[in-house]
Amino acid sequence: MTVAKIENSGARSSFNRRMLFRAAGLAALAGLAACATVLPTGEGAGVSASAVGTLAGIRASAGLGPLLPDPQLEQAALQQSGYMARGGRMTHTTGWGKGFASRVKGNGISGAAAENIAEGRFDQQKLFDIWMHSAGHRRNMLDPRFTRFGLAYVRHGRDSSLRYWSLVLGR
């Protein structure tokens, strides 16, 4: 009887440890899931065609040629805007080490590229005004290496006046 109790006690102890480890694992996963809350997104659009004139004027003022709208760059911009809207924050990464370079490459884009992002309750004209008054964003738009661009936005799912903007530039 004592042997049976010891064996039974050991099995119960082993069973309890397994249950404890499983519970701890589930608690950790629940914590991670809470950190990765995904917000609903609203309407989104690639709007490169509507920005051709604005970008041409910006570049002409610096003696540069116009940029052409590009569907691959627009897709990369829309992808980033959607990611930002779902996360509810501005970022150049898409999580877990997926930065701008890997996203651009994943969209079939090679060569030099740059990205401007923004979050706010403003229209396209105000967006470019903000970027032109920021040294880094201005430098990207006036980089003579770039000949193509893609512009997109996605609205925040709970606040339709809040837009997440992305401009991707490339050669």
Outline where the language-model segments fall.
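Bacterial Sec signal peptide processing site at the extreme N-terminus
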Residues: 32-55
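Short, surface-exposed glycine/acidic/tryptophan-bearing loops
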Residues: 74-122
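N-terminal secretory signal peptides
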Residues: 1-15, 19, 23-34
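A generic secondary-structure micro-motif detector
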Residues: 44-45, 70, 90, 127
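Solvent-exposed, polar/charged alpha-helical surfaces in well-ordered, non-transmembrane soluble domains
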Residues: 49, 53-57, 75-82, 102, ...
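Surface-exposed patches in mature extracellular/periplasmic domains of secreted proteins
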Residues: 62-75, 88-96, 114, 138-144, ...
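Disulfide-stabilized extracellular recognition modules
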Residues: 2, 6-7, 122-171
